[in-house]
């Protein structure tokens, strides 16, 4: 991690700790006030506790063009993106995705789709082009192949996520051990799941000075809960399959209902967040993270779009090609989860739990 980034972050937090004008805005400032020095672990914890509401920038008397140049939202955004690379495993992949961003995500989706398409064409070419009145996905990609591919990828991704979040949690708790209480855990989960701090003191997020909007929070909700519904759909389908109830499932079945609702959320949420990003004051964000953000949002959107199209056209000739493209996009999304913007939700939830165990404990 860059020494200059840590030194600049420490300087800003020291100035803010002396001023304390913004102490009521969000959890960052009460947590900051408990510290007199700011090492790497402190800075990365505070950075992930920040929800980038932007209020402190416009309230700060030392913000640019003041010679101190205090722009805390941007500096914490830079530290956040550095924390993803710091804690991820294996570290080399984190650096690659951070540097390439959007290009890496889209290229990976295209390559995986092309490889799966070529494999299907070589081993079962007829299934790609013929109508499939039953909508049987396994006639295109055998059940064992699909389970093996995604089972292996899921195991790798889960291992990477667990290692990363464990590293963050362990380093964030470098001070004397804090007991994990049910009350603190419940408050942290509540704050994370409701996005309670994705606004300042109960008012909507700033998109620019004196410009407020609740949409950033709502689009986050659409994205997050859309993802959860799609995950629930896949989980229910896995249970059905284990019970011998094979896909495809009826439009009125639970997996399809959950997946459709989640898919709609994953169309509206990422599209809305992409628009919101372009409307926000550039002073609030780190330009270096644009590629990671946009890659994640694009993969979520394309996963949902291809999945919904596959549902509608599953008994048509296009089903085979659509299935391969959808699976390639989903696999690209999965592979990039531990190294992109997805982890910000996990690190922020961990930071909120720590905050509720310590500062509010």
Residue ranges and their predicted role:
Residues 77, 83-361:
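Membrane-embedded alpha-helical bundles of multi-pass integral membrane proteins
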Residues 52-58, 302-304:
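A generic, lipid-embedded transmembrane alpha helix
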Residues 6-15:
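Local sequence-structure signature of Cys/Sec-based thiol-disulfide redox active-site neighborhoods
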Residues 1-3:
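Recognition helices and adjacent regulatory flanks at domain boundaries
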Residues 8, 41-42:
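Secretory-pathway extracellular proteins and peptide precursors enriched for disulfide-bonded cysteines
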Residues 48-49:
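Structured cytosolic domains appended to multi-pass membrane proteins
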Residues 17-38, 44-45, 55-83:
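Iron-sulfur cluster-binding cysteine motifs and their immediate structural context
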